[in-house]
């Protein structure tokens, strides 16, 4: 049933876009003879001639505006002369002290416990490949 409603909707849409009216005396499109008299372009009657433009076809692109000589390098300052730096937009910061811990309790000299003593004597490396016994 849903398919029938969809088909009916498509049919109504097609009839509406074509402009079909109920009266037979007023066709929606004039006959071809009336169109020729109205001055509409006619279709070509033979094969196209090389070099001739297509009849009635509008140009694809409009002509671009005339180009004016643009030389942005002339706007640059002379060599060795540069524009001044623009002013900074960030708010000014108060001067920073040299001491990273300016106030309050100071950190201990070395907060870490002392490291264990390390034996720097060379140790013998263990033999990772012990000799194998032959199995019989």
Swiss-Prot record:
Protein's UniProt keywords contain Signal: yes
Tissue expression remark: Expressed in skin. Also expressed in heart and skeletal muscle.
Bias type Basic and acidic residues, positions: 118-136
Xref: Pfam families: SPR1
Gene Ontology cellular-component terms listed: extracellular region
Compositional bias annotation for Pro residues: 44-69, 84-116
InterPro entries linked to this entry: SPR1
Keyword Signal listed: yes
Main location: secreted
Subcellular location field: Secreted
Keywords from the named record: Secreted, Signal
Secretion signal, residue range per the UniProt entry: 1-22
Region (Disordered): 20-136
Name of protein: Psoriasis susceptibility 1 candidate gene 2 protein
């Amino acid at each position: 049933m849903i398919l029938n409603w969809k088909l009916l909707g498509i049919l109504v849409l097609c009839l509406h876009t074509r402009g079909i009216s109920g009266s037979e005396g007023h066709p929606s499109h004039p006959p071809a003879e009336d169109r020729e008299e109205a001055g509409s372009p006619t279709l070509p009657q033979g094969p196209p001639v090389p070099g001739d433009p297509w009849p009635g076809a509008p140009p694809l692109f409009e002509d671009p505006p005339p180009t004016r000589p643009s030389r942005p390098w002339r706007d640059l300052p002379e060599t060795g002369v540069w524009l001044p730096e623009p002013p900074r937009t960030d708010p000014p910061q108060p001067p920073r002290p040299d001491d990273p811990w300016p106030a309050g309790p100071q950190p201990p000299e070395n907060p870490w416990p002392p490291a264990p003593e390390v034996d720097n004597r060379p140790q013998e490396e263990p033999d990772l490949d012990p000799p194998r016994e032959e199995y019989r």
